[in-house]
Amino acid sequence: DPDKAKELLAEAGYPDGEGFPAITYKYPSLQLDSDMAQALQAQWKTNLGIEVELQAEEQQVQVAERRSGDFQLARMRWTADFTDPFTFLSMYRSNDSYNDNKTNCPEYDELMAQSNEESDPTARFELLHQAESVLVNDYCFGVPVLNSSNIYLVSTDITNFEIDPSRNMIRTKYLVLGDSSSES
């Protein structure tokens, strides 16, 4: 919501981005990430009047700097390990190795711990929802920008083709090639 962002910037003393401190956005030097960084930079300038310096880095350097907390803005990519909100929310626990922005919120940690112990799925999801609300409302934790997808062309000779939705991988265990009943 660019209008709301402009309003909040003005309330913070930066009308139209004037006087806003310099920001550097670090990202891996891959084409997709470069394209995305340039698009974000243009949107921040056009919508908010904020100048953002772009810094492309080798993947290993970018990850190491992010993990050490040496960044203002950084690109992070995450693919779910399993189809559950916990796989995304767990990385913001205070003691999680993927907590690159060093979120430290006892209330959030407690809700996540409770969700991990809860056996009732409905109650567990409610705890996860509460934890997510704490992140969204009380912390600047991360902003989902991109959701990748794949397109698969599958021969009509293949049956039982199935994608694992959490990792976008083909489940090959039950794939069948051709009609085995017509063999002689």
Positions of predicted regions on the chain:
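Detector for C-terminal structural segments
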Residues: 31-43, 64-184
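Active-site lining segments that contact anionic ligands and/or coordinate catalytic metals
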Residues: 20-22, 49, 140-142
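Short beta-strand and adjacent tight-turn residues that come in two discontinuous sequence segments
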Residues: 53, 57, 75-76
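Structural transition elements
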Residues: 1-11, 29-35
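Histidine-bearing beta->alpha loop at or near hydrolase active sites
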Residues: 59-62
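Short alpha-helix C-terminal cap/hinge motif
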Residues: 39-54
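Surface-exposed acidic, glycine-flexible loop patches that form ligand/cofactor-binding
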Residues: 11-19
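Short, well-ordered beta-strand elements
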Residues: 20-29, 52-55
